Amino acid sequence: MKQIVIAVCALLAAAALFSGEVAAQGQPNMYGPTVTADQAKSVAAAAVAEARKNQWTMAVAIVDPAGDLVYFEKMDNTQVGSVDVAIAKARSSARFKRPTKAFQDALAAGGEGWRLLSLEGAVAVEGGVPLDVGGKIIGAIGASGGAAQQDGVTAAAGAGTLK
């Protein structure tokens, strides 16, 4: 019984710490209507154009607010492993309503940031960005194929097409 009480107290303490960190960051935007197929294609086209401009090869995934795939594009010669990573980055960004770089930075800072390792579906690598229209998150984009910063630049270029 004592072990159960200790475990419950530990869980409550962890929840309190995490909620305080989220509150300090400000509340993320609310979800809006789901990204349309046309919007998804436009976002992906802008991301691919940015990658081509920089001579990067990328996999680009667009998901709805639940993290379900809406559109996907893999540029020629993109490493196969980037397919699943792009989808995971988009899904993480949509479900947690923040760029995956926020997780990357928190994990790199150590300390309480290590808690991210226990969040199922949280990807702590730059390259996932929420799609925000009028202050509402309608989905997310994930890009993978280059260095993390290149993935982030590519995803941001796509996300920047929606306002």
Question: What are the functions of these language-model segments?
Answer:
Residues 1-4:
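Positively charged n-region of N-terminal signal peptides that target proteins for export
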Residues 7-21:
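Bacterial N-terminal signal peptides
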Residues 22-163:
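Flexible, solvent-exposed loop/hinge segments and secondary-structure transition points
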